[in-house]
Amino acid sequence: MKISATYFKQYIPLLLLIMISFSSKAQYFGQNKVRYKKLDFKVLQTPHFEIYYYLKNENMLKRFSQDAETWYKMHQEVFRDTFLTKNPIILYNNHPDFQQTTALQGEIGIGTGGVTEALKNRVIMPVMELNSQTRHVLGHELVHAFQYHVLLEKDSISLENVGKTPLWMVEGMAEYLSIGKKDAFTSMWMRDAMLNRDIPSLKDLTNSNKYFPYRYGQAFWTYIGSQYGDTTIVPLFKNTAKYGYENAIRYTFGYDDKTLSGLWKNSIDAHYKPMLKADSSQIKITGTKIIDNKNAGNMNVAPAISPDGKYVAFMSEKDLFGIDLFLADAKTGRIIRKLTSQISNGHIDDFNFIESAGAWSPDSKQFAFSIFSHGKNQMMIINVANGSTVSQTAMNQVQQFGNLTWSPNGKDVAFSGMVEGQSDIFSYNLDTKEITQITNDVYSDYAPSYSPDGKKIVFSSDRAAIQNKNINAALPINLAIYDISAKEVKNLDVFPGANNLNAQFSSDSQNIYFLSNRDGFRNLYKYNFDGNTVDQLTDYFTGISGITEFSPAISVSGTDDIVYSYYRYQRYTLYNAKLSSFKAKRIGNQEENFDAAILPPMENYGVNIINSNLNNFDRFEKIVADSMKTVA
């Protein structure tokens, strides 16, 4: 059975990639899957879909259904194809439920965001933590539904031929049609490739496992769509499935794949090289390198520095048997011990490591983090001194949660979690064992962090974008402050069109450090409450990043030591820097320029269907209630 998956958007060493989940080219092996609860699915019919759901959140279900129909209209303009029967979508309320699906055999890893079957053409996916993620995964998977429909049903191409289509073509096309050419995250990858003088040819993409197909495939299709027009995409894709990519390129463009590879490379160089400053300041890294591929792995992510600044906990594939949680000296990088491991700890089915980080207790003696165990996320707290488990706690109805933060008085742990497809901020009291829901609204609230004085919680949210009636397919992620005593949320009016994430308070609670792509790059910023001012602290050509754009990549100690994950050479390296080490530059709160986020070429020389539609996603006419009915 040929299937396609989305959202694990990052290259990691091949062994780990297979171990975690990369189902686009893989077969499932038919393992028996443990089910922890029975789900009572209903069926909602829309003009072009049958949505199998058990979600009780009617507003979320309505929005999902409307998005599915909008994606259908947008993809139909590109594929020029119509579904004669309603396409099935199986929707899970959260990722832990999705991992237990019986619609597919075999294990689904924490990194698989969605699956589309070739033969049944079913889309199987969960509601994601962020509204924009759910929308993107749905759009991505529906591209696969169109791909399979147009190849297998309309053109009668054999499943074997479809399976031979290069993965970078299949997945890259799904990324381009669901994200477009404005993507700061993929642009970071392309700048890294240019800087490393390692821009692959199409032959390299096809034959080597070195280049992650989602990112490079998206960049390739952006080039094709921008240079030759989006009307070229489907003919090239269909010809590739029929004749192979070399013959398809020659048939479509009149020259060979080597020539097209050269043209694509020249476009990348011409776009990004002028952005590289002559003084090399953008590749001079601030701080001390503490964790890299010499003392750990290639993927060293989710750093969390202890409040006293002595230790850093992080996730790494150091031992090549999967992702483990390690403890290191925050000053020297010396690995002290492995805190816990999925292999050695039978209570851990998986670490919630891709877009989540753990939290230290105020006394730096305990560490809390999110795991996947027995069909749901649970909070595990360990004693750092000896690695023993202090507690393991399920959060009742909050079956998916992550990005923990420990209150300065030591009594509460706050986190972002999902209930009925809605992402909010919660807190858990360690004494009373009670869960308090801090936010409760349609907005996606994500990655909270306590202020050291215990008065505020900062988090990321799409509330400002939704309140301002954003019409793009992508919803910008802005910063918000929760006043604990007043129980009020206030938006910070900083870089409104950017994604502003991973916010952390300074030790005096007067500043917030955060990551932003406000200029198309991914750098560290500091916001000051008193002056309502923003300083840019880094100016890197690649960027500070985790596995995905939404992954935690910075952590701040009680002494304002900042540990961050720097992306270069397709690897993640941890640095530790004092605040005084950064060269701060004052910039305007509204100062944005996304040229560096645009995948090349900058201009569209052909018919621009995809990006125009993505920029006007919410201007498409929405289906009304009369077009939706529950039939079972």
Locate each region found by the language model.
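Short loop/turn segments that connect beta-strands within beta-propeller blades
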Residues: A330-G333, N383-G387, N429-K433, D483-K487, ...
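Beta/coil-rich, acidic/histidine-enriched accessory regions frequently appended to metallopeptidases
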Residues: N32-R35, F41-V43, S208, P235-K238, ...
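Beta-propeller fold detector
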Residues: I335-Q342, V390-A394, T436-T439, K490-D493, ...
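Active-site-proximal alpha-helical
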Residues: I51, H75, W168-D183, R191-D257
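Outer-membrane beta-barrel initiation region
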Residues: R586-A632
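Blade-terminus and WD-like Trp-Asp/Gly-His loop motifs, strongest in beta-propeller folds
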Residues: P303-Y311, G358-Q366, N403-D412, P448-K456, ...
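Juxtacatalytic substrate-recognition/specificity segment
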Residues: A26-P166, A184-F185
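A flexible loop/linker signature enriched in serine peptidases of the S9 family
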Residues: N295-N298, M315-F326, I343-F353, A368-M380, ...
